């Protein structure tokens, strides 16, 4: 009896062990399964959330971009220099086309549709077929910004063949009404309507605007649901630029710069700037050779084209040459035009005045080096005005030596030559100067009449303007105002001068000397009846470079 009870107890104990182990095993398996499911859910809902959300939205919605109109660029008088004309972009949805091809009633094939689009759009049939194969995509651009006639022909092709999956959307094409006028200032946009050069690139953020979006719902068959299911995100047109440029000034500046460049066979081109000396606003800026903004990739200058044809230069190199704005991208020796600054600094420091006289024998020796005047026989006895009119090198060397190396160098800094003008155009080069610690008396003598250093034309004209406008240095600029699409002014250029470099009296005396250059000196051909004209002739020794 006792033996039976012991056996029964052992059996129960064994059963409890088995039950416990089974429970533990089930628990472990349950936890493991739960962890696997939790991990999978984490992967699906957290790590791959964006992916699956995108796929779901892709199945349920269709998005159409609403293009923003790029801002207009105006000259100071309201003339349109760059505008956005309406155009249309042709795109296809490979996914939708693939679904259409599965329907028995479809009238077209990949080959027939791609051939038709290729013929109308001038795009290879192979590239269109490649786009059609990308069935994971809903948006493949076939041709950007086609004209109205082409767009209508595409619509006719789609309607005749009942094609669903190829669409046209309104876009904007950049157009430059004046062609090549002010090309190097305005610049141009690329095929994606993004600014690449000039103001188009410098003010890309302001001009481009913000695209909008129409999100429409689709049913399980891929068909669009009624408009009440749409969400519309409005586009915002770009801001407009109002420039300081005057198209009349620009036209004549381009005309005469080209004439001079051709007359003197300037192989490397020429540049010219007209500036309002009281504000620093650029009224005209020319870089020659020029190009057509509406066809910016075509090299139009005969000499540049000849170099491409004879193999001495590549198309890309010549394109870069014609796009280069020599007024601010390149540096030159200023030659005698720099004497305006030497004159103003010497007057301001009391080194010379209108009673000063100079003797010119045709040369001067500094630190054992003989420096010649342009008139090698000498100008003889001269007043300050006469020395300016004669552009006498020894006279201006004496002005520079009277200032001393440190004072002269500080005037170059004060005139803004050492750090660049800060004009609101990209790519301004910096001048090339001897370090102040190495600046000797001989260097000073050469600098005083504009030799042995380089400046950009824009920096030089800003400094020259300070000599005659009462002594104030202004920052050169080409954008006077920015307006939003409603016409409200969102930016107005501040015409406060950066600093005063010389006094009103010094500036008045400098103007008198420069007027003498035109009335009685070497610049007589610059006279204009009825106007007070001042000027300064100047030629650096490096004419062999082919620049004007």
Residues covered by each model-derived region:
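Periplasmic/cell-envelope proteins involved in peptidoglycan metabolism and beta-lactam response
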Residues: 1-302, 331, 406-414, 526-529, ...
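Beta-lactam-recognizing serine transpeptidase/beta-lactamase-like catalytic domain environment
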Residues: 5-6, 82, 88, 219-232, ...
């Amino acid at each position: 009896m006792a033996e039976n009870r012991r056996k029964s107890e052992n059996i129960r104990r064994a059963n409890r062990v088995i039950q416990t182990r089974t429970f533990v095993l089930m628990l472990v398996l349950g936890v493991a399964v739960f962890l696997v499911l939790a991990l999978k859910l984490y992967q699906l809902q957290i790590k791959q959330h964006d992916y699956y959300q995108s796929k779901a939205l892709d199945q349920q919605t269709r998005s159409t971009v609403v293009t923003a109109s790029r801002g207009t660029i105006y000259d100071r008088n309201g003339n349109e220099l760059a505008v956005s004309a309406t155009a249309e972009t042709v795109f296809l949805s490979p996914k939708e086309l693939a679904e259409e091809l599965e329907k028995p009633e479809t009238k077209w094939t990949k080959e027939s549709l791609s051939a038709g689009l290729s013929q109308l759009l001038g795009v290879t049939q192979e590239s269109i077929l490649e786009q059609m194969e990308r069935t994971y995509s809903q948006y493949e651009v076939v041709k950007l910004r086609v004209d109205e006639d082409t767009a209508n022909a595409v619509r006719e092709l789609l309607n005749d063949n009942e094609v669903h999956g190829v669409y046209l959307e309104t876009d904007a094409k950049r157009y430059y009404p004046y062609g090549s006028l002010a090309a190097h200032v305005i610049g141009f946009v690329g095929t994606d309507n993004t600014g690449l050069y000039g103001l188009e690139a410098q003010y890309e953020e302001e001009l481009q605007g913000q695209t909008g979006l129409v999100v429409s719902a689709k049913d399980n068959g891929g068909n669009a649901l009624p408009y009440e299911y749409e969400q519309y995100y409005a586009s915002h047109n770009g801001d407009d630029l109002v420039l300081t440029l005057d198209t009349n000034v620009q036209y004549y500046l381009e005309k005469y710069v080209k004439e001079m460049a051709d007359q003197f066979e300037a192989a490397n081109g020429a540049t010219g700037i007209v500036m309002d000396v009281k504000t620093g606003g650029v009224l005209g800026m020319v870089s020659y050779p020029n190009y057509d903004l509406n066809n910016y990739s075509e090299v139009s200058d005969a000499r540049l084209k000849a170099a491409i044809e004879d193999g001495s230069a590549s198309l890309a190199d010549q394109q870069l040459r014609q796009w280069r704005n020599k007024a601010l991208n390149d540096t030159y020796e200023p030659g005698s035009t720099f004497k305006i600054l030497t004159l103003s600094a010497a007057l301001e420091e009391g080194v010379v005045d209108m009673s000063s006289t100079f003797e010119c024998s045709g040369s001067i020796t500094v630190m054992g080096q003989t420096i010649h005047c342009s008139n090698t026989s000498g100008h003889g006895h001269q007043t300050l005005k006469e020395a300016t009119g004669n552009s006498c090198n020894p006279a201006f060397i004496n002005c520079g030596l009277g200032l001393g190396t440190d004072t002269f160098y500080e005037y170059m800094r004060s005139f803004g030559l050492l750090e660049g003008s800060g004009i609101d155009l990209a790519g301004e080069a910096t001048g090339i100067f001897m370090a102040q610690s190495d600046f000797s008396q001989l260097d000073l003598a050469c600098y005083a009449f504009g030799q042995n250093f380089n400046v950009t034309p824009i920096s030089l004209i800003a400094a020259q303007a300070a000599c005659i406008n009462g002594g104030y240095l202004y920052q050169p600029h080409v954008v006077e105002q920015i307006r939003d699409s409603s016409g409200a002014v969102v930016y107005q250029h501040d015409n406060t001068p950066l600093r005063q470099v010389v006094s009103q009296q010094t500036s008045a005396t400098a103007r008198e000397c420069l007027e003498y250059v035109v009335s009685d000196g070497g610049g007589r051909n610059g006279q204009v009846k009825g106007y007070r004209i001042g000027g300064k002739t100047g030629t650096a020794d490096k004419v062999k470079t082919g620049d004007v």
